[in-house]
């Protein structure tokens, strides 16, 4: 994350987490208000969906459309899941809203030199796929949808002959991948507070049955908590050594997967804003150091 006149290259990784991503939206909006950007942003699930606005430089867009439509049955809900197989309605949430109702600024998005990558999980291999999103068009949005496709709550998303689901299954926090890109400074935005430890998936028996034809994907689901916690350990080590800068919630941002309360989304968003403002001097010092 760097201002345009700085010569150091900067990478940014955004964790997902459904509506906990409103925290990330708040952080990114404050950074945009202060003129901060980066060379390469990689996001998973909600991190990719809401990070989209960081490349298009649309302050307030993520919280605006989520508050506007979180209670709209066309946007998400059990009815959509029963009717289409997708908890978040593919046509409305991923096409009508970003293209017609609250459009992405494609001109700014495409002019922005920031490289933007989303993470998806290939259900055949169980491996993470890192896909660049240079255009912001409907094809790129399909990749965002794939990155955000929660197993069981969403059908696998077919793109170019492969099927994908939630990138968090394969790489919940893509920090190691980002470090491998070789940037001078690296920032990670988490959506869980300090001290969080991920537990084994409580519905693993059901997931084994649903995905019995995809053993590698099942293995990724089974080991997800282990990989996640190991990543947190690596981040803690790197953070202590001054190798990275981590922004994480200063208080709980726990929220239902299908939150219908705009005020609750606003609460989480404001925590992100406050944390971004509070950590801004330290972030700027890290970038300048």
Task: Identify the residue ranges that each predicted region occupies.
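Patatin-like phospholipase
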Residues: 1-44, 52-289
């Amino acid at each position: 994350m760097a201002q345009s006149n700085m010569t150091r290259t900067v990478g940014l990784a955004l964790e997902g987490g459904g509506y906990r991503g409103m925290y990330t939206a708040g952080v990114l909006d404050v950074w945009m208000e202060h003129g901060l950007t980066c060379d390469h942003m990689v996001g998973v699930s909600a991190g990719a969906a809401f990070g989209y606005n960081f490349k298009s430089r649309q302050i307030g867009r993520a919280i605006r459309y989520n508050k506007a439509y979180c209670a709209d049955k066309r946007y998400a809900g059990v009815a959509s899941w029963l009717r289409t197989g997708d908890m978040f309605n593919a046509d409305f949430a991923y096409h009508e809203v970003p293209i017609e109702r609250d459009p992405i600024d494609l001109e700014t998005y495409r002019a922005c030199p920031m490289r933007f990558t989303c993470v998806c999980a290939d259900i055949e291999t169980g491996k993470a796929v890192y896909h660049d999103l240079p255009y912001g068009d409907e094809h790129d949005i399909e990749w965002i949808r794939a990155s955000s496709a929660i197993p069981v709550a969403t059908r696998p998303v077919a793109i170019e002959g492969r099927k994908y689901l939630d990138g968090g299954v394969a790489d919940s926090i893509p920090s190691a991948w980002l470090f491998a890109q070789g940037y001078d400074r690296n920032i990670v935005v988490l959506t869980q507070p300090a001290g969080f430890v991920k537990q084994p998936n409580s519905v693993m028996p059901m997931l084994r049955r649903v995905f019995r034809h995809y053993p590698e994907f099942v293995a990724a689901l089974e080991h997800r908590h282990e990989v996640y916690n190991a990543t947190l350990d690596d981040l803690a080590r790197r953070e202590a050594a001054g190798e990275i800068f981590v922004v994480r919630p200063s208080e709980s941002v726990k929220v239902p997967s299908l939150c219908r309360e705009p005020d609750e989304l606003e609460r989480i968003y404001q925590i992100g804003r406050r944390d971004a403002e509070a950590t801004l001097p330290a972030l700027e010092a890290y970038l300048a150091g």
